[in-house]
Amino acid sequence: MERWTLSAILAFLLLLSLLLPSLLIMFIPSTFRQHASLWKARSLAKTLLMASSARLTPLSSSRTPCVLRQDSKKL
């Protein structure tokens, strides 16, 4: 097993110190994008929920869909 020399250790630490900030720069923007997409998904879900409840309210008071379902079951 070979021992590391002081110059090799310093070279490795220098390389690590140069690579670490670039890795952080690569991964930090992806976390911000995830929060934005999560916010958009929640907003879309809320919009779809409001739209579906507005459309379904008149249908539940109407008797026509119930009659159509019963006729299709007899066939």
Swiss-Prot record:
Question: Signal peptide location in the record?
Answer: none
Q: Which UniProt keywords apply?
A: Cytolysis, Host cell lysis by virus, Viral release from host cell
Q: Which domain of life is it from?
A: Viruses
| Keyword field contains Lipoprotein | no
A single Gene Ontology MF term assigned here is: enzyme inhibitor activity
Could you give a single Gene Ontology term from the biological process aspect? killing of cells of another organism
**Coiled-coil blocks:** none
What function does this protein fulfil? E protein is responsible for host cell lysis.
Other facts: Phi KhT, a host-range mutant of phi K, can grow on E.coli C and B, besides K12, and is more thermosensitive than the parental phage phi K.
Protein's name in the database: Lysis protein
Taxonomy, top ranks, is:
Viruses, Monodnaviria, Sangervirae, Phixviricota, Malgrandaviricetes
